Amino acid sequence: MLNEIFNKQKTQSEKSLEALKKDFTTLRTGKVNTHILDHITVDYYGTQTPLNQVATVLASDASTISITPWEKPLLKTIESAIAAANIGVNPNNDGESVKLFFPPMTREQREENVKQAKAMGEKAKVSIRNIRKDANDAVKKLEKDKAISEDEAKKAYDEVQKLTDTYTTKIDESVKNKESELLKV
């Protein structure tokens, strides 16, 4: 019974950590990352489709992303979807592909991204605390139903807190690593 609670807490905490790392890919660092376009969808025959499912998205160099659609008529649609996404660059349509030229990041942009990374980290910590609350509630229910003793419940609460502390530390480390990556010129 308790192992199920711990395993569930661990699985959910791991998912929160992975979600944080995925969120971090949307932050721009010193070099371009094609994941900055992951949230962009284009109208493909009446259906909103992720950009990477209708085109090849490549980082040509440290400051350029090239998007080559699999069907030429999509060029204009892709161009307008990127412009509407407001990612800080203007798309350039050369007739074959759409190119995005990212200027070097300013100190202010880097610091703004650090703030966003910290906010993402806080959101992940809130998620971890909510997972802890659910686990503690499950332990409390077992104790109330007399399925476990008071001593077992105390040990279970300690284990839940230990798992929470472990994942909170992992989140802090991830934020710190992302911060140093963002501030590196």
Swiss-Prot record:
Domain of life: Bacteria
Main localization of the protein described in the UniProt heading: cytoplasm
Subcellular location(s) of the protein: Cytoplasm
GO MF annotation, one: ribosomal large subunit binding
Sequence similarity: Belongs to the RRF family.
Functional note: Responsible for the release of ribosomes from messenger RNA at the termination of protein biosynthesis. May increase the efficiency of translation by recycling ribosomes from one round of translation to another.
Name of this protein: Ribosome-recycling factor
Gene that produces this protein: frr
